[in-house]
């Protein structure tokens, strides 16, 4: 005995109508994809407190908090700029004023490679549909 709900029937109708629409990952709807594609590159981040941090991106989370390794912290608040070397640092997104990406980095190719990685990982976890059994006579 199968019970169908109206909600399920509506969802089925909506899925068939929207099957032609192109799927866009949530990461590509924000700047998150840019910074995750830049993982492993060296950038300069200026904070709201007028400090500059130069380091290598190791991780970026969904809230755009950036983790840098081998970072050099320059405090421009004082007359004599003091440089500090930090092994790892986590920068909260609310403290970032702007991020300087080097000119030598081609963002188009990086984003293209990153989108290929996402699609490959998506295919890896996608379920395959079973073939229907052959008809019996």
UniProtKB/Swiss-Prot annotation:
Gene3D superfamilies: 2.30.30.100. Residues 30-105 form the Sm domain. GO terms for cellular component: cytoplasmic U snRNP body; nuclear body. Disulfide bonds: none annotated. One of its GO terms (molecular function) is histone pre-mRNA DCP binding. Pfam families: LSM (PF01423). This is Putative uncharacterized protein DDB_G0291015. It comes from Dictyostelium discoideum (Social amoeba).
């Amino acid at each position: 005995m199968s019970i169908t709900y109206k909600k399920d029937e509506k969802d089925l109708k909506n899925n068939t109508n929207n099957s032609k629409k192109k799927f866009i990952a949530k990461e590509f709807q924000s700047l998150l994809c840019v910074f995750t594609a830049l993982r492993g590159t060296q950038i300069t981040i200026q904070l709201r407190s007028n400090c500059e941090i130069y380091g290598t991106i190791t991780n970026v989370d969904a809230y755009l908090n950036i983790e840098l390794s081998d970072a050099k912290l320059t405090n421009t608040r004082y007359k004599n700029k003091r440089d500090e070397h930090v092994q790892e640092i986590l920068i909260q997104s609310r403290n970032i004023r702007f991020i300087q990406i080097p000119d030598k980095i081609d963002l188009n190719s990086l984003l293209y490679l990153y989108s290929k990685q996402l699609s490959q990982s998506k295919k890896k976890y996608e379920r395959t549909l079973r073939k229907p059994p052959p008809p019996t006579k």
